[in-house]
């Protein structure tokens, strides 16, 4: 889990556009965020396995 202070810091608008970065909307993780879903890989995987993300299913071939 991300620190509450870091999540609060990210909510503020930065002085420069370059300073913005993505965070997982579910857990607040700053790394490996899938932009389309705004989720980190871990949360994305959990929700995909549960079938809670429409149009996403586990690949099998």
From Swiss-Prot:
Its cofactor is Zn(2+). One of its GO terms (molecular function) is rRNA binding. Binds 1 zinc ion per subunit. Transmembrane segments: none annotated. InterPro entries: Ribosomal_uS14, Ribosomal_uS14_bact, Ribosomal_uS14_CS, Ribosomal_uS14_sf. Keywords: Metal-binding, Ribonucleoprotein, Ribosomal protein, RNA-binding, rRNA-binding, Zinc. GO terms for cellular component: small ribosomal subunit. Zn(2+) binds at residues 24, 27, 40, 43. PROSITE patterns: RIBOSOMAL_S14. Disruption phenotype: Cannot be disrupted; as the protein decreases in cells 70S ribosome formation decreases rapidly, with concomitant loss of uS2, uS3 and YugI (general stress protein 13) proteins from the 30S subunit. One of its GO terms (biological process) is translation. It holds the Pfam family Ribosomal_S14. Belongs to the universal ribosomal protein uS14 family. Zinc-binding uS14 subfamily. Binds 16S rRNA, required for the assembly of 30S particles and may also be responsible for determining the conformation of the 16S rRNA at the A site. The major uS14 protein in the ribosome. Required for binding of uS2 and uS3 to the 30S subunit and for association of the 30S with the 50S subunit. Part of the 30S ribosomal subunit. Contacts proteins S3 and S10. This is Small ribosomal subunit protein uS14B. It comes from Bacillus subtilis (strain 168). The gene is rpsN1.
